[in-house]
From Swiss-Prot:
It comes from the Eukaryota. This is Transcription factor MYB63. Residues 138-161 have a biased composition (Basic and acidic residues). The lineage of its organism: Eukaryota, Viridiplantae, Streptophyta, Embryophyta, Tracheophyta. It comes from Arabidopsis thaliana. InterPro entries: Homeodomain-like_sf, Myb_dom, Plant_SW-associated_TFs, SANT/Myb. Expressed at low levels in stems, roots and siliques. Specifically expressed in fibers and vessels undergoing secondary wall thickening, especially in inflorescence stems. One of its GO terms (cellular component) is nucleus.
Length: 294
């Protein structure tokens, strides 16, 4: 792998920024005496703390005596267009054939003026094709509109012929076959419309018509019956609630008595009494048996 071109100077020891008038005088005087055969060694020989590339660009773009100032002429612009068509964006090669002009100036003029001018000229050259297309589109629209108008006129004439044929049907008995066909079509259309109306009427649901002006006695009777039903329902519900409440109260009282007897020990006394009664009954039976034996 090659290391490429070596740098022309040490960038840390070189002055940068805009040139001063003293530096311009040194560069001009040195080039007028010795020329510019080697731009790398020129800064050391002339005593300038500048890079060789900076000296070259300063001389070519600003300080050389044959440098032209001002706007480009029309001949120069035409030559730039032709050379750009041949060489492309090789600005230094184009500048070599235009004495007194730098490659930077030529590039700026191309991008700011000449390129836009060529684009506009090419657009104007392509413009004549667009009116033809617009004419064709307008013609197509006119044809469509005329076709629609013709169809509408035909329909209106058809309607007029139908009306005239129906009006003069009784007087002219020997009609043409075309008139007969038109009459038949008209009758079919009317019959179909009539059938549609009948079907719509049949499809409607049967709605009960309730008169608004009814007898007030009926409404009062309905109100009283509703109130009576509500009162009976309320009484039944209240009676059922009362019975259920009484039963629940009795159950609670019984439960309370049982609980009280269990706490006081009355249940055991009852059991003892039953045991004594059974013993007494058994003893009485034994006595009776003994008496029967003796």
């Amino acid at each position: 792998m090659g290391k490429g071109r070596a740098p022309c100077c040490d960038k840390t020891k070189v002055k940068r920024g805009p040139w001063s008038p003293e530096e311009d005088i040194k560069l001009i005087s040195f080039i007028q005496k010795f020329g510019h055969e080697n731009w790398r060694s020129l800064p050391k020989q002339s005593g300038l703390l500048r890079c060789g590339k900076s000296c070259r660009l300063r001389w070519i773009n600003y300080l050389r005596p044959d440098l032209k100032r001002g706007n480009f002429t029309s001949e120069e612009e035409e030559t730039i267009i032709k050379l750009h068509h041949n060489y492309g964006n090789k600005w230094s090669k184009i500048a070599s054939q235009l004495p007194g002009r730098t490659d930077n100036e030529i590039k700026n003029v191309w991008h700011t003026h000449l390129k836009k001018r060529l684009a506009q000229s090419s657009g104007t050259a392509d413009e004549p094709a667009s009116p033809c297309s617009s004419d064709s589109v307008s013609r197509g629209k006119d044809d469509k509109s005329s076709h629609v108008e013709d169809s509408l006129n035909r329909e209106t004439n058809h309607r007029n012929e139908l009306s005239t044929s129906m009006s003069s049907g009784g007087s002219n008995q020997q009609d043409d076959p075309k008139i007969d066909e038109l009459r038949f079509e008209y009758i079919e259309e009317a019959y179909s419309e009539f059938n549609d109306i009948i079907i719509q009427e049949v499809d409607k649901p049967d709605l009960l018509e309730i008169p608004f002006d009814s007898d007030p006695d009926i409404w009062s009777f309905l109100d009283t019956s509703n109130s009576f039903q509500q009162s009976t329902a309320n009484e039944n519900s209240s009676g059922s609630r009362a019975t259920t409440e009484e039963e629940s109260d009795e159950d609670e009282v019984k439960k309370w008595f049982k609980h009280l007897e269990s706490e006081l020990g009355l249940e055991e006394d009852d059991n003892q009494q039953q045991y004594k009664e059974e013993e007494s009954s058994s003893s009485s039976l034994l006595k009776n048996y003994e008496l029967m034996i003796h």
